Amino acid sequence: MDQVLETIKRAHQGDKAARDRLVQENMPLVWSIVRRFSNRGYEPEDLFQIGSIGLLKAIDRFDTAYEVKFSTYAVPLIIGEIRRYLRDDGMLKVSRSL
């Protein structure tokens, strides 16, 4: 876990290689979440791309002071990004405000 935190710190300082490494190491996490949404009528590769956006947001927003694993923090952001896409891409547009 210390190695992951160090990699995240380097990514926050602008190290592109560290960011790429985090993305590569967490691709299986994104795929496991994409499988949950496999019966929604969308191509898995499309959902993977959307989930990857959530992963990148998690990398950028993760605070190393949090006492949680990175994957625990990233999962809700990845799921949220996919759900937002499914909601906004649907045939019926529903306003989020009341």
Regions found by a protein language model. Give the residues of each.
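Alpha-helical promoter-recognition and RNA polymerase-docking modules of transcription initiation factors
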Residues: 1-92
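Short, intrinsically disordered, charge-balanced linker/junction segments flanking boundaries
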Residues: 93-98
